[in-house]
Amino acid sequence: MASDHQTQAGKPQPLNPKIIIFEQENFQGHSHELNGPCPNLKETGVEKAGSVLVQAGPWVGYEQANCKGEQFVFEKGEYPRWDSWTSSRRTDSLSSLRPIKVDSQEHKITLYENPNFTGKKMEVIDDDVPSFHAHGYQEKVSSVRVQSGTWVGYQYPGYRGLQYLLEKGDYKDSGDFGAPQPQVQSVRRIRDMQWHQRGAFHPSS
């Protein structure tokens, strides 16, 4: 019987996730290194996240403990102060984190106007879309089906506003991916930088 978990030939081995949280801006003050999920940052001895250094990622952080509230996606790199990781500038609170699994070279996502995958839809394959309106899709986004890859949806065009992590699976309504209202106006891939592919965009009604 064939295994579903056979490794793909030539597939890069993911690095162990590693993120360092500093209490002060610009990587100063008390710090704590994480290599796995952290449901409550304060339990590590870090009172407040002032800056973040991602050495191997990606990660998703949350405004509240136990992975609740506003979401913040962290990819490998430096985040010297809170407004470098929030695209909404609504809160400077970062209370829990977990690594994001990126296990697919291909990326395919379908966004639907209505809950339960109905109404007008837009399909995106191996591409980032900074503005749905510019591509002729002006409807709300009430449900999402991620066929492959890991994505970040944004409330506004240009990757601004609230962020929504979209991992492989079905989201029957906007609450399933943490959106207070069915508004997603841009989307991008989270990529393992060892993979690069040219994108293709397929609007459909």
Curated annotation (Swiss-Prot):
<feature type="glycosylation site" description="N-linked (Glc) (glycation) lysine; in vitro">
    <location>
        <position position="108"/>
    </location>
</feature>
<comment type="subunit">
    <text>Homo/heterodimer, or complexes of higher-order. The structure of beta-crystallin oligomers seems to be stabilized through interactions between the N-terminal arms.</text>
</comment>
<protein>
    <recommendedName>
        <fullName>Beta-crystallin B2</fullName>
    </recommendedName>
</protein>
<dbReference type="GO" id="GO:0002088">
    <property type="term" value="P:lens development in camera-type eye"/>
</dbReference>
<feature type="domain" description="Beta/gamma crystallin 'Greek key' 2">
    <location>
        <begin position="57"/>
        <end position="101"/>
    </location>
</feature>
<comment type="similarity">
    <text>Belongs to the beta/gamma-crystallin family.</text>
</comment>
<feature type="glycosylation site" description="N-linked (Glc) (glycation) lysine; in vitro">
    <location>
        <position position="68"/>
    </location>
</feature>
<feature type="glycosylation site" description="N-linked (Glc) (glycation) lysine; in vitro">
    <location>
        <position position="168"/>
    </location>
</feature>
<feature type="region of interest" description="N-terminal arm">
    <location>
        <begin position="2"/>
        <end position="16"/>
    </location>
</feature>
<keyword id="KW-0677">Repeat</keyword>
<feature type="glycosylation site" description="N-linked (Glc) (glycation) lysine; in vitro">
    <location>
        <position position="121"/>
    </location>
</feature>
<keyword id="KW-0325">Glycoprotein</keyword>
<feature type="glycosylation site" description="N-linked (Glc) (glycation) lysine; in vitro">
    <location>
        <position position="140"/>
    </location>
</feature>
<keyword id="KW-0971">Glycation</keyword>
<dbReference type="InterPro" id="IPR050252">
    <property type="entry name" value="Beta/Gamma-Crystallin"/>
</dbReference>
<feature type="domain" description="Beta/gamma crystallin 'Greek key' 1">
    <location>
        <begin position="17"/>
        <end position="56"/>
    </location>
</feature>
<feature type="glycosylation site" description="N-linked (Glc) (glycation) lysine; in vitro">
    <location>
        <position position="120"/>
    </location>
</feature>
<feature type="site" description="Not glycated">
    <location>
        <position position="42"/>
    </location>
</feature>
<dbReference type="InterPro" id="IPR001064">
    <property type="entry name" value="Beta/gamma_crystallin"/>
</dbReference>
<dbReference type="GO" id="GO:0007601">
    <property type="term" value="P:visual perception"/>
</dbReference>
<feature type="domain" description="Beta/gamma crystallin 'Greek key' 3">
    <location>
        <begin position="107"/>
        <end position="148"/>
    </location>
</feature>
<dbReference type="InterPro" id="IPR011024">
    <property type="entry name" value="G_crystallin-like"/>
</dbReference>
<feature type="glycosylation site" description="N-linked (Glc) (glycation) lysine; in vitro">
    <location>
        <position position="11"/>
    </location>
</feature>
<feature type="site" description="Not glycated">
    <location>
        <position position="18"/>
    </location>
</feature>
<dbReference type="Pfam" id="PF00030">
    <property type="entry name" value="Crystall"/>
</dbReference>
<feature type="glycosylation site" description="N-linked (Glc) (glycation) lysine; in vitro">
    <location>
        <position position="48"/>
    </location>
</feature>
<comment type="function">
    <text>Crystallins are the dominant structural components of the vertebrate eye lens.</text>
</comment>
<keyword id="KW-0007">Acetylation</keyword>
<feature type="glycosylation site" description="N-linked (Glc) (glycation) lysine; in vitro">
    <location>
        <position position="172"/>
    </location>
</feature>
<feature type="modified residue" description="N-acetylalanine">
    <location>
        <position position="2"/>
    </location>
</feature>
<feature type="region of interest" description="Connecting peptide">
    <location>
        <begin position="102"/>
        <end position="106"/>
    </location>
</feature>
<keyword id="KW-0273">Eye lens protein</keyword>
<feature type="glycosylation site" description="N-linked (Glc) (glycation) lysine; in vitro">
    <location>
        <position position="76"/>
    </location>
</feature>
<feature type="glycosylation site" description="N-linked (Glc) (glycation) lysine; in vitro">
    <location>
        <position position="101"/>
    </location>
</feature>
<feature type="domain" description="Beta/gamma crystallin 'Greek key' 4">
    <location>
        <begin position="149"/>
        <end position="191"/>
    </location>
</feature>
<feature type="region of interest" description="C-terminal arm">
    <location>
        <begin position="193"/>
        <end position="205"/>
    </location>
</feature>
<dbReference type="GO" id="GO:0005212">
    <property type="term" value="F:structural constituent of eye lens"/>
</dbReference>
